[in-house]
Amino acid sequence: MSRRHRAEKREINPDPKFGDVVITKFMNAIMFDGKKSVAERIVYGALDVVEGKVKTDPVALFHQALENVAPHIEVRSRRVGGATYQVPVDVRPDRRQALAIRWLIKAARGRNETAMIDRLSGELVDAANNRGTAVKKREDVHRMAEANRAFSHYRW
C-alpha cells in the first residue's frame, strides 16, 4: 500500500427527499449489493414511522440519535516494550459519524421486530431518547477509555 498520496474524500450528494448528506451516508451504509432503492425504502419508511410515532421532525430526531450514539473517546492498542496497552484517544469528527452510523445499523439489525423498517425506527427513537443497544455500545466504549485513563500518556 503506497504512502505517497492520501485518498481524497469523495463528495456525497444529498438525498432527494430531505436534502441531507448524512442521510445519504446512512443509506449507503444500509445498502447491500448496490441495491440503493431498497435502502432508500428502508430509511424513508423508518423515518415516516418515526414521524408517526413521535410527531416530531424525523430528520431532527435522526440527527439527535446519531449525536447520542457517537463516541467522543475510544481506546486504541499501542505496543510499548513487549506489552500492549489500550490507550484512550479522542475520536475524529468524521470517524465519530461513521461509528455512530455503523453502530445504529448493527443495533437495528440485532432487534427482533419483523421488518427492517420497524427495527430501524425503533432503534432511532431509542437512541434519540438515550436508550437502546447503540447507546449502550457508546457507553461501553467510554467506560473502557475511562478504565484505561492511566495509559493516556502513551498517546501518539
UniProtKB/Swiss-Prot annotation:
Keyword annotations of the record: Ribonucleoprotein, Ribosomal protein, RNA-binding, rRNA-binding, tRNA-binding
CDD domains recorded: uS7_Bacteria (cd14869)
Record's keyword annotation contains Ribosomal protein: yes
PROSITE patterns attached to this UniProt entry: RIBOSOMAL_S7
Pfam families: Ribosomal_S7 (PF00177)
GO molecular function: rRNA binding; structural constituent of ribosome; tRNA binding
Subunit description: Part of the 30S ribosomal subunit. Contacts proteins S9 and S11.
Descriptive protein name: Small ribosomal subunit protein uS7A/uS7B
Organism (species): Bartonella bacilliformis (strain ATCC 35685 / KC583 / Herrer 020/F12,63)
